């Protein structure tokens, strides 16, 4: 994992996001009655491991700092309480759920251009990714999400680490992945990346991973270290091989 000031990046991003939420039209609405919003995350309610909780805490802090704490209420729903991510992103598109925190890969299911960030080994680090975003790489994706899905990105953030492979045996090269059923996001680009690395890439909803690993339906999973810890996937598979094949960003 790269040594980066993730919390400062998240705080800055959400300051901008809170400013966007607190637009004149919304403030007018908020004066009439408290606006209640829901924020969904697939990960547990634990700021040590779960990026969604960190982003939620910073969002609430900035809403209060803008003097809107009594007018805008944001409720946090961790651990897929509002549904699997693929269902939640469609609910956000329809306006049924207000916000979600997820890797950009989930949005690629409804607006394919977002999947450009999921290309294997596209970035070497999160600082490199941030530099690209600061120089305009994020704008085409933001515009496409707004135009094609009515979804506005209010913040980009670092994930808690690059994605690597957790499996029942160590991975030193493609030969070690040959035929191994490795869970991937339901995203064609990430699935193809793992296939090219030698694995039998197996798309699966996040909430099904633990039992599939436990039952031997899967041989492994690719994810970032804190997600592995928060979800206790290490209880089923003992080898975490730092393939670092993906540095996809988080989006709110």
Q: Would you name each region that the model predicts?
A:
Residues 2-129, 137, 143-252:
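N-terminal secretory/targeting leader peptides
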Residues 133:
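Short, flexible helix/strand-to-coil boundary loops that buttress conserved ligand/catalytic motifs
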């Amino acid at each position: 994992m790269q040594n980066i000031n993730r919390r400062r990046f998240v705080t800055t991003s959400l300051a901008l996001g809170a400013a966007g939420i607190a637009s004149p039209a919304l403030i007018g609405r908020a004066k009439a009655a408290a606006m209640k919003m829901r924020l969904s995350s697939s990960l547990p309610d634990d700021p040590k491991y779960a990026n969604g909780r960190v982003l939620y805490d910073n969002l609430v802090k900035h809403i209060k700092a803008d003097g809107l704490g009594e007018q805008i209420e944001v409720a946090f729903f961790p651990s897929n309480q509002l549904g699997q991510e693929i269902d939640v992103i469609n609910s956000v598109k329809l306006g049924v759920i207000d916000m979600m925190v997820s890797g950009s890969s989930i949005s690629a299911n409804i607006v394919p251009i977002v999947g450009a960030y999921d290309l294997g080994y596209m970035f070497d680090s999160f600082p490199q990714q941030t530099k690209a975003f600061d120089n305009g790489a994020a704008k085409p994706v933001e515009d496409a999400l707004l135009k094609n899905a009515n979804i506005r990105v209010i913040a980009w953030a670092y994930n808690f680490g690059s994605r690597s492979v957790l499996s029942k045996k160590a991975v030193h090269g493609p030969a070690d992945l040959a035929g191994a059923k490795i869970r991937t996001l339901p995203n064609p680009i990430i699935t193809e990346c793992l296939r090219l690395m030698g694995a039998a890439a197996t798309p699966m909803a996040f909430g099904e991973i633990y039992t599939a690993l436990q039952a031997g339906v899967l041989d492994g999973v690719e994810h970032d270290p804190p997600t592995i810890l928060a979800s206790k996937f290490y209880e089923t598979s003992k080898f975490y091989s730092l393939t670092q094949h993906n540095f996809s960003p988080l989006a709110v």
